[in-house]
């Protein structure tokens, strides 16, 4: 279910339905109550409904009748019901919409009601006739239902309201009978059993009842975490004020009934077995004679599964009288269904299906078919769970005994609610235990966010990481609930799971009942009881007489189910559609009903719209960028300073607050620490962000009081204004805790290598400190990184790893971060900038480099294999980087030797440019593009590197994130070796023991570029083209031209072909790729393990998304996506498709190179293609590639460059604040946003261009001011940077490009506007107009205009005062004007936009001149 389906319905109650037996004056088929049988059962019908019209978003289902009366409408003799209980029966059912899966709750009250309409003279009402007993014997009662249909599960309160409604109708019925002598006349009229003209006295009663009902249906719904609706239904002496409130996302969802019912009825052990069966998605049927017990048990089981969500049909009470109801038990999908005890008898079911588990609440019996097995819960987690549940239940039992003498009912209710919270907390703790879902997010990887999140659970690594891999967790991982849970962890709608995980367990902090949080909510009072109503007097009279009167002896009686269903007579042919017979309210009071259309918020000084769109903050570069052209830079900086620093004490809109700015500029990584502090204030939830108020925040650091849950005084409305932003960013911090992205990999890889390499003889460590501190861990990791760099540097100069160093290298390569470091150092193709349509270029190595590469990469593969087989490994995305090097790096046999830096004569090193003239003179046939050296010529290795550059490089490496090192900056590549071809006729020497390389197909035709036509870029190419398929042939003219750097092929060379054996000519060096020594020489079993490839793929996807920035605050990105237009949504989806398809393309190439079975390869890739929901454009390319796979193992499929290498970002060093004393950060200017990163590379903020309001800078102070709009609030951020002008120009250019592409939407952003103001000096009211040329203030008798060039300063004061300073050029003085307005902030913002537009226009004029 998506967010739209979860939107809050503004109606508290959708419908009130009266269900029972319709009176039919005609029709012989209707069973008569005067028949010989005393009891008959008919199909229930809707007798009356309020309102009579359906809602636009909800049509009342016709089958609601059988849900209200599951065993049919029973009509029986009052004589038989006389000795029965007089308590109406209450229960709950659910209506689920098929298309949208929306759930509505039915809260039903059933009772037997008489419709005897015999008239008695008024003067004989109190006389008892002689045949009274005979008449009572002949009267009949019929089952009648009062039912609320609502989107909201206020079960207990609705129960009380239904009882009150029945009491109101009974009271009016009693008063009408006294006045008219017509018995049960009100009930008869409301249920359609009265066919005579209605007397005025009775009509008055009907009108008051229907008015009360329609007023009740007009009640609004509370806004979660913001408001509470207080409904006054009767005077206080007759009924309490019913308070409705919904918890916010940091608390458990509302369960307004005793949640512990399954444990109380079945016992803890049996209830846990039923919970386990539901958890594993078995088919479960629960039966009982008590409707309420069975429906509550079903709902409780579903609620106790949190944080899992039951993904299949849930029917708390399946009616026995519903046609074909038994077919649901044959459904192929799992289900959780409650039925009355008569269901199987009535539906003539003799035997349950063999895959259905039956639970009988009446006998406490659990029937499990022989073919099914419910595994036991893992230990010791199950024992701990049972102990917590027993403690909670025993506490309730103890309090029950105590309450009999000393505790009030209200206190007892509090304890019951606390018991329910304790049960829910115990279940959450069980799910979070080590053997169940402990460290669950470390094994999830986000594949995509749009159009809906797709998250992959690495089941294999997850199971291997469990201390005890039980059958339960193995089966649980295969359920849809766990798959959905992985997606919910990315952007959870309810964060209680995370809070309990952090140690926040008390009912006051996570409880769902209003008594724990209602004090902080704004009340919305609603009056249902009209002032002129006489219903209260009728109730008082009825209450006084009910004890001494036998009025109810033959009217309302109990609904206890008949134990002998055989005695009932069923009329199953009476299924009719009574929709046309439902009439409007009898008293013509339809006008009373006012359907709530929007959520109700109390009036405040600031206008807030609950459904305000995030797109309201968008602006175009023309209207949001400004320079200092209008005024001096100092004045503009002061303007920005005033706009930012003026606090708002009234709770209305303000540009910024000092405390807010400081708190918002705090990196996410620092704010995230609150999640681990169980002693923090309740308001400082693990996911809270933004400012509540600085005082409250300071208290929350030391104490755990209720003050953190409340917002006091005038700051309350400010909290409501900022609530949407808090909720938005609340998710982002949960994401940093639970999101399946590479951040988890970073935290894992920062763990010390000590545990894994302590046995190594090559690392000297102190044995006296078995648990090193974090500082020691960081030092050890730094030493390991330095060691790995030395190995890589040696390999780059051609020195191989020694035999004594090899074990140490193998140990180090078991760490994923060090493998990533190796790949970033050894991959010489990283410095080649490629476009999206190019392919990764091949790189030539020297013989020494080749041998060193092979040895180091072998150690990497061995470490990857260890990681794959180690429970709880930190990922192995590096396998793709290793295979990329093996795929593209080669050594040309016979190509000569390059003098390494260790040579004694580095100054005499020969470069390829020395022989360029000789190469040009040769007229030999040229080799196709596959033999061209693709590296750009650089400075030879023999040249010395200055110490400064070396140190800088090492510093950059040390500050890089260990798990995800970004691509290294351009560095000097090894020289192109001098190639001395062997004598004519002499075949190239092949080392002994080396396997002959497979024949290479010719590369596609290449295009020439004028850039690379310099002689030093040319290399000898002497082999003629080999015969192959036409798509691989090069033109003859191309072969005779001087060889140039090739361009990528336009089509994929994946045609089915058997490569011809290429016989090397005497003049052509044979290429020997690394994969031939690394893969072909030793066959690793992991290449045939498809789960290994899938895990590596999702690891690399997570890594790529992290580098590109696709996973930074996913909730914000999803909300932004929903606010974009269709074309922008498609663009974002296509970006994710390209990233995924590129990785799938490369994985296919690697699997072919590693010899994975072709059929298995195709199945796995196609499965991932569907799992990732890749669009048609990109999936078509992958399918074409899979259809034309080469049949020979090798590197025939060219590689595509990763998306992270294509993204070209401009980064600037900034310091938050007005000086350089703050913490250094990096600001990246991207295509559609500005990303702020910490020095560790972690993204802390992302600001989309469409939400930027204004950008200014001051070259004098080196300060860049940036305003952004979020939920109708504007926040300003200041950054000190030496390159403020360059940063401003870069951001401006990026925003202009985004606007040209349509990314920044400017629709609906009208410049200027009119605002009502009140002059504080003259005490006049008027209109303030913000225009392009200035500000005009219009009063009743005069008008003031202030030109734009004369405005010196404008800001807000106190939140509701707009202050404007005008420079009077004639007098040479400044005039200050103050205007009171509730829209002061918007006036200031409008003036700021006009300044920005004027500044941009002025700059354009200067450029045109």
Swiss-Prot record:
InterPro entries: cDENN_dom (IPR001194), dDENN_dom (IPR005112), Death_MADD (IPR056574), DENN_C (IPR043153), MADD (IPR039980), Tripartite_DENN (IPR037516), uDENN_dom (IPR005113). Residues 26-230 form the uDENN domain. GO terms for molecular function: guanyl-nucleotide exchange factor activity. Expressed in nearly all neurons. Residues 773-784, 902-913, 1020-1031 have a biased composition (Low complexity). Pfam families: Death_MADD, DENN, PH_MADD, uDENN. Residues 654-701, 761-784, 902-1008, 1015-1034 are annotated as: Disordered. It is found in: Cell membrane; Cytoplasm. Residues 1109-1184 form the Death domain. Residues 963-1003 have a biased composition (Pro residues). Residues 915-925 have a biased composition (Basic and acidic residues). One of its GO terms (cellular component) is cytosol. Residues 680-691, 761-772, 941-961 have a biased composition (Polar residues). Residues 392-496 form the dDENN domain. GO terms for biological process: apoptotic process; chemical synaptic transmission; defecation; egg-laying behavior; lipid transport involved in lipid storage; mating; positive regulation of acetylcholine secretion, neurotransmission; positive regulation of anterior/posterior axon guidance. Belongs to the MADD family. Interacts with cab-1. Guanyl-nucleotide exchange factor that regulates small GTPases. Converts GDP-bound inactive form of rab-3 and cab-1 to the GTP-bound active forms. Regulator of presynaptic activity that interacts with rab-3 to regulate synaptic vesicle release. Is also a regulator of the cab-1 synaptic transmission pathway. Probably by converting rab-3 to its GTP-bound active form, plays a role in the recruitment of endophilin unc-57 to synaptic vesicles. This is MAP kinase-activating death domain protein. The lineage of its organism: Eukaryota, Metazoa, Ecdysozoa, Nematoda, Chromadorea. The gene is aex-3.
